[in-house]
């Protein structure tokens, strides 16, 4: 697709790591699927933008599209195993759980850790874990420590930097309180105390950075970057398939085809729209025809190739959902900051229809070039007939090795986020 091939890798470069944001909320917030892409296909963009109260009166989070494996729950072990396999093949070293809203999803995390420990014990270099915290950061770190990091049996699942498990968190109580209470009125009583010495010594901390709010610092870790070329936070760059740096994703999908009286352009930073998957800096335009090809994502990878940071952080793997609201001040247009449709969304996970596996292949291709030297020579396929009655020496000239991930076949028999959805795959 798009003429892409994943290059053959040679020696690994030193000081190269790739991480990816990972969401655990599927099945926790809604038992009903509302898919914006399907609504647009059936009734058009105008209906999706202006009739939110009709098709989603309860205000449940929307899926912008359908994942390849269906509307799965985050505790579906078949999905966890597929994710770990795909991310391993793409060269991802760690996943960062989105705990930015204080929720740590301990049951889902334990199941993921068990799968990681099992597969790594069998020799498969699947990604390890960390957490990305933000709101009530100190409280969230304590929860993650109590639930996961105080359990030695999960050690093999922890991603470490400088010999300590990585934790993205604000550990200054005053700053944590200011950010939390300033952004969330319902948490006005939040009054964090310093983390204990044991926890402070246990983790390697980096500070979560909020674009448009926090300055660029060497110890910062942005979940998304609203600048291009991407900022360098010490040894780290953050990339995303799309970026809502100017406006909500739902508003950006309107483009410039709607008159100003329908939506105040003042809230769009001078009338600009956000960078979608098909945005190109050559013409400074979003182009739906380029969305599946990932022109915006590739532009950022080209920055990485020039800057050569030690860590590349990707936002993200499997968000899929976004909260929706409407505001009479803005013409009751559907408001969704984080995602709306294929063009204006940030997921890299495989999609049913749409871009299919294009963003996984694009990620794998760029990660290989970033992390590995590209050899001048490589092992070629050998085509030969094997006599099952002859000896093992017949295999000596066959150098390539292919392994199935995991020592056992694992089927699927699970419900989706909507109880009526059932998914089955034989072992």
Give each language-model segment a name.
Residues 368-427:
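Order/disorder boundary and secretion-linked terminal/linker segments
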Residues 1-387:
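Glycan-processing catalytic domains of CAZymes
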